[in-house]
């Protein structure tokens, strides 16, 4: 065991280094080749804000519209994310420059925003909304800053550039609100190798925008929809007065630049993080610390157990041994079925379902099959996998329920299929009603909700029943000792054996292993960032499984040594103790990182956080429970019982 613990951290470290070599490569999407002057379609995705957490579709604001609005057919994941991809009137041609062009309106007739439209635009700007566009499925990014470099190395300068996703709708200054009504698009292309008798082809490899606010009086437009921007700082920004009508032009320009970025690396701009070094060192530190502590805990348990088992198996000292306190004294009660075995087995079945789903999703994403360029693929895959993993959840729940002397398998199967999913659906439905009330694109449409219910009752529930049926018919787990008819009296327990104290103690190590990844995941969810470090996430998931298992074994061992055989529910709750720290961290993140002040955004945050904490508790509790159950069966099978 000690030898195994010696090489395990190094092998995992090597594995994580291997994952880094392809961490930012995004396969799975075929490139599109453009010829000179081919149209490059600019589409809008949505409007987002980290302050409100309510996405809106692009045309919820009075932007210029094309002659025919066409929405893209979306998958389940895109709908759940609030994406509403739609065409826009921007006319962009491959490698064709445009200095300035009026998007809608005429030289003598600018766009007029009504009082209601002006109020809505001003409200969205004050709520710090971002606009998200895509060109050739590549999201638009805004260049934030360029650090100076004394050596003048352009490549090094390029690495120091920071980007944010989308562009700001506008800005406020001295209680006045200004709209970004001119967009300077900068598109980078990579020239493909020229074949014989064929013209050059190009691929879009980066999409940037420089948003500007230009006052109506400073723009000069002609009858051909061309315009002239003021030079330098001679212009004033376009103010939006929410109390009256506002007139303005929506304009844009297009600039093309050749780039040596290859198509396979074009997502690096969005996936590279500025603090990646901190991320690396934190992950490595977590690996070393967690496995070092896990090794120590394992050695303590193994050495203590060897001594206990050796003493218990000495026939000469058997009477002295039985007079001592220890885990062997509760051998006749340790496998006594707990209260509410149906609920316990149902929760553990849902935990198995979650475990299988998360493991497969992370592994497939680590291989690059669920790239950000395939919008909504991650969430769609997770939903369908959870449905189909119901057969494994039902099987494990059915077998455990029979082991716990349960008899009503049909009711147990229904409980497994509906308890956790029902809570999730109920919370999501209530939150969705509030989102509907705000007319947000984040609200799940009624047909999609019906489709989800059909998937639940048409796929998940039958599969859970099928798995439960076979699990209940299978031979129950073989417990190595018989259960006494009369329960043993439990002595008074010390304060540190309290259930809540156990939750606090058991949750520290697993939470410490995943703390850094949790920060990046929260940033991706609540601050509209991309997350693609699934190599790291897979490593952290393995660490989480190992640490939860080892901590669970330690906790159940000390509980049995205290002659308390009621370990079933307690171990399930204590093993999920890291979920308590996730909740505490979520509150800390809300207070210190987010600028949410309104009721509905706060309700959404804590509603979805509650679902996350519940799911994480089920996951870690299930991992710890089965590790402890295997451990208990193993140690009682190793001693002689008279």
Swiss-Prot record:
Subcellular location: Membrane; Golgi apparatus; Early endosome
Extracellular topological intervals: 24-281, 368-376, 438-449, 523-535, 592-598
GO biological-process terms attached to the record: cell adhesion; phagocytosis; positive regulation of protein exit from endoplasmic reticulum; positive regulation of protein localization to cell surface; protein localization to membrane; regulation of intracellular pH; response to hypoxia; vacuolar proton-transporting V-type ATPase complex assembly
Cytoplasmic compartment spans: 303-346, 398-416, 471-501, 557-570, 620-642
Spans traversing the lipid bilayer: 282-302, 347-367, 377-397, 417-437, 450-470, 502-522, 536-556, 571-591, 599-619
Protein name from the UniProt record: Transmembrane 9 superfamily member 4
Membrane topology of the entry: Multi-pass membrane protein
One GO cellular component term noted in the UniProt record for this chain: membrane
Main location: membrane
Keywords from the UniProt entry: Endosome, Golgi apparatus, Membrane, Phosphoprotein, Signal, Transmembrane, Transmembrane helix
Signal peptide: 1-23
UniProt similarity note: Belongs to the nonaspanin (TM9SF) (TC 9.A.2) family.
The organism's taxonomic lineage, starting at the top: Eukaryota, Metazoa, Chordata, Craniata, Vertebrata
Modified-residue entries (Phosphotyrosine), positions: 312
PANTHER family for the chain: TRANSMEMBRANE 9 SUPERFAMILY MEMBER 4, TRANSMEMBRANE 9 SUPERFAMILY PROTEIN
Function: Associates with proteins harboring glycine-rich transmembrane domains and ensures their efficient localization to the cell surface.
Cited Pfam families: EMP70 (PF02990)
């Amino acid at each position: 065991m000690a030898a195994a613990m010696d090489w395990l951290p190094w092998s995992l470290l090597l594995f994580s280094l291997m994952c880094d070599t392809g961490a930012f490569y995004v396969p799975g999407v075929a490139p599109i080749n453009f010829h000179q002057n081919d149209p490059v379609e600019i589409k809008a995705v949505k409007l987002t804000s980290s302050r409100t957490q309510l996405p809106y579709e692009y045309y919820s604001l009075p932007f210029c519209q094309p002659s025919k609005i066409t929405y893209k057919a979306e998958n389940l994941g895109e709908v759940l994310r609030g994406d509403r991809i739609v065409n826009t009137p921007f006319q962009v041609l491959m490698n064709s420059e445009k200095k300035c062009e009026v998007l809608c309106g005429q030289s003598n007739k600018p766009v007029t925003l009504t009082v209601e439209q002006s109020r809505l635009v001003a409200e969205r700007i004050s709520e710090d909304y971002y606009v998200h566009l895509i060109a050739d499925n590549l999201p638009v990014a805004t260049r934030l800053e360029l650090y100076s470099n004394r050596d003048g190395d352009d490549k090094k300068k390029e690495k120091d550039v920071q980007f944010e996703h989308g562009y700001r709708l506008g800005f406020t200054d001295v209680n006045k609100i200004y709209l970004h009504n001119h967009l300077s698009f900068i598109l980078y292309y990579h020239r493909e190798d020229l074949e014989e008798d064929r013209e050059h082809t190009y691929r879009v490899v980066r999409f940037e925008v420089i948003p500007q606010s230009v006052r109506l009086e400073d723009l000069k437009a002609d009858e051909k929809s061309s315009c002239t921007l003021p030079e330098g700082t001679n212009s004033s920004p376009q103010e939006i007065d929410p109390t009256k009508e506002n007139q303005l032009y929506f304009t844009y320009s297009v600039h093309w630049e050749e780039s040596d970025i290859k198509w396979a690396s074009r997502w690096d701009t969005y996936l590279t993080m500025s603090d990646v070094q901190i991320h690396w060192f934190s992950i490595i530190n977590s690996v070393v610390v967690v496995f070092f502590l896990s090794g120590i805990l394992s050695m303590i348990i193994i050495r203590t157990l060897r001594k206990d088992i050796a003493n218990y198996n000495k026939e000469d000292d058997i009477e002295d041994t039985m007079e001592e306190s220890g885990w062997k004294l509760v051998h006749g009660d340790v496998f006594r079925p707990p209260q509410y075995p149906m609920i316990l087995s149902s929760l553990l079945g849902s935990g198995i379902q979650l475990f299988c789903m998360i493991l497969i999703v992370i592994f497939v994403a680590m291989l690059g099959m669920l790239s950000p360029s395939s919008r909504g693929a991650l969430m769609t895959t997770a939903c369908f996998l959870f449905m189909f993993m119901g057969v494994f959840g039902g099987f494990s729940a059915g077998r455990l329920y029979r082991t716990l002397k349960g008899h009503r398998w049909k009711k147990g199967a229904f409980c497994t299929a509906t308890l956790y999913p029902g809570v999730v659906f109920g919370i999501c439905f209530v939150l969705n009603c509030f989102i509907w009330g705000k007319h947000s694109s984040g609200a799940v449409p009624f047909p999609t909700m019906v489709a989800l219910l059909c998937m639940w009752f048409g796929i998940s529930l039958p599969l859970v029943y099928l798995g439960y049926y076979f699990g209940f018919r299978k031979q129950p787990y073989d417990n190595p000792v018989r259960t006494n008819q009369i329960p043993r009296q439990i002595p008074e327990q010390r304060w540190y054996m309290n259930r809540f104290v156990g939750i606090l103690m058991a949750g520290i190590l697993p939470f410490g292993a995943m703390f850094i990844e949790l920060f990046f995941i929260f940033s991706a969810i609540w601050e509209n960032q991309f997350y693609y470090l699934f190599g790291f996430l897979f490593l952290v998931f393995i660490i989480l499984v190992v640490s939860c298992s080892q901590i669970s074994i330690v906790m159940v061992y000390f509980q049995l040594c205290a002659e308390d055989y009621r370990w079933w529910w307690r171990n399930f709750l204590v093993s999920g103790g890291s979920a308590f720290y996730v909740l505490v961290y979520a509150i800390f993140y809300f207070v210190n990182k987010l600028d949410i002040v309104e009721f509905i955004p706060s309700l959404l945050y804590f509603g979805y956080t509650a679902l996350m904490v519940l799911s994480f508790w089920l996951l870690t509790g299930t991992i710890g429970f089965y590790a402890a159950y295997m451990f208990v069966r193993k140690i009682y099978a190793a001693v002689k019982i008279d």
